């Protein structure tokens, strides 16, 4: 217990002060507006009433939030219209959203300072060819072949709002800022309840994207911080951890010690550490814990995690959220793929002098398969096909021009091929390509009030084929040192696109 407290105090000693005054600096909200609401496009900050933005209005909004009438209304009537006075200039939803984004930027400052304070001599070199999230797959192919068990963890998130505030107290000791955060959370939810309503949570997430990401990453980093402590105490072997792997940043070289880092709290979602016995990968609210050893050891780690969430974060997580499987006999859902490590037979001919004989060996192989049923379900939900995969037209797009229709269908088709390009079996991708191509033809035929056969005879199938194979031409130019191939043929090459981050949302392709 003393080791645990000492380990925790190291983080508490780096608390930050005087964050609250920054909330009244106008340039903070200019950054929030440009970066949080309108991406990277610089725009003039103008309200709904066409009045210039002023930090004085933010100050008034904060003062009104502290008034008793507002608090009573937000707590006792959480479901009524939160725009108490829509015509009131400084009480509009626009400024509430700006204040939320500005607050998130301000509280991220201490973590950014911590990143800048890292020693320069330990700067990790960047590898341009490993910047994609898909560079994790070669790592899995290299390491998972030698492991025995895998735990698939759904990181529990429904947590009491007060716990989220308390977690920040370890690193931010600015009482006014923490009070303001409490008022903001009260603004959307009653303190006597949990965030178990998915409708209310998604509403809060939609209006406060940056703040939600910061709170979520704060919670996850706290959980992983003490998970590392448990890992250090669970083995007497010398520990030599790899550094953090952050999405679109770099692979790190072997370091003597593993240090917790908090760079880019708003967007970085992938992180792993490893040692000779255990590997940890986190992505999109899920985590994978793979290791050697016995089944009893994995059960022990499962109990560790359940008790940790219960006694440290004060909420109960169901044991079924942690699945333990043997790698050789099961598959797991990972980033839109069904991955497994099966044993494949390999027949080898051996020649000894005048005698020859065959040796049948079984080799492990990291296999990735496209989930056909899941992807067809997404296409069906988006009204490109029926539930059984039969292509249908998309009436809502018939008002678009022919080129826009072709462009939309073609972009979806190419994105699906991009994201699942590393699959070991391409039959599912060819089926998806057929569904999208025929759905496009039926949509165009419906627009021109014709049949698919008549429309295709008039237009010719060559144009559609050329449109959908445009990406294949780029594909062959990108890999000139390898054997060229066409998507229309059969091949077994597995190529992970290195620019996949731009369409990373295709893990759930059409949502």
Swiss-Prot record:
Cystine bridges: none
Compartments reported by the entry: Plastid, Chloroplast
Major subcellular site: plastid
The entry's keywords: Chloroplast, mRNA processing, Plastid, RNA-binding, tRNA processing
Entry GO terms, CC: chloroplast
Record InterPro entries: Domain_X, Maturase_MatK, Maturase_MatK_N
Gene Ontology molecular functions: RNA binding
GO BP terms in the entry: mRNA processing; RNA splicing; tRNA processing
Function per UniProt: Usually encoded in the trnK tRNA gene intron. Probably assists in splicing its own and other chloroplast group II introns.
Similarity remark: Belongs to the intron maturase 2 family. MatK subfamily.
Protein name: Maturase K
Gene: matK
